[in-house]
């Protein structure tokens, strides 16, 4: 259920930009306040395994998240500008597709 390769995810950092971190993979989803039983993390800079910069494990926060294209109740997204980015070289590795 991981999106892209292990530890391979690139998302612009920001106060409303978080990722699910129940494991070390970049999942196909964006964590926002909801009832999804996963930990969310404030996103720190992450890099592909072949990057010269060490992978930074995000800090875990409250157990809530919202997975895109899931059956979980969606949170109120009114007024939130959300943009996601797929790191070059990871597009074809997503399963399921984002």
Curated annotation (Swiss-Prot):
Matching InterPro entries: Keratin_matx
Sequence repeat placement: 3-7, 8-12, 47-51, 55-59
Annotated Gene Ontology cellular component terms: cytosol; keratin filament
Residue numbers spanned by region 4 X 5 AA repeats of C-C-X(3): 3-59
Keywords: Acetylation, Keratin, Repeat
Molecular function GO terms recorded: structural molecule activity
Tissues expressing this chain: Wool.
In-chain residues carrying the UniProt-annotated modification N-acetylalanine: 2
Disulfide bonds: none
Subunit structure: Interacts with wool keratins.
Protein family according to the UniProt entry: Belongs to the KRTAP type 3 family.
Xref: PANTHER family: KERATIN ASSOCIATED PROTEIN 3-3-RELATED (PTHR23260), KERATIN-ASSOCIATED PROTEIN 3-1 (PTHR23260:SF3)
Stated role: In the wool cortex, wool keratin intermediate filaments are embedded in an interfilamentous matrix, consisting of hair keratin-associated proteins (KRTAP), which are essential for the formation of a rigid and resistant wool shaft through their extensive disulfide bond cross-linking with abundant cysteine residues of wool keratins. The matrix proteins include the high-sulfur and high-glycine-tyrosine keratins.
Protein name: Keratin-associated protein 3-1
């Amino acid at each position: 259920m991981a999106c892209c390769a292990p530890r391979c995810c690139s998302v612009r950092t920001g106060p409303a930009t978080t990722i699910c971190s129940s494991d070390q993979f970049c999942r196909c989803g964006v964590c926002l306040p909801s009832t999804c039983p996963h930990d969310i993390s404030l996103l720190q800079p992450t890099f592909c395994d072949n990057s010269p910069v060490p992978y930074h494990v995000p800090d875990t926060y409250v157990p809530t998240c919202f997975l895109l294209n899931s059956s979980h109740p969606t949170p109120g997204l009114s007024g939130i500008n959300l943009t996601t980015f797929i790191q070059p070289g990871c597009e074809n590795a997503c399963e399921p597709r984002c």
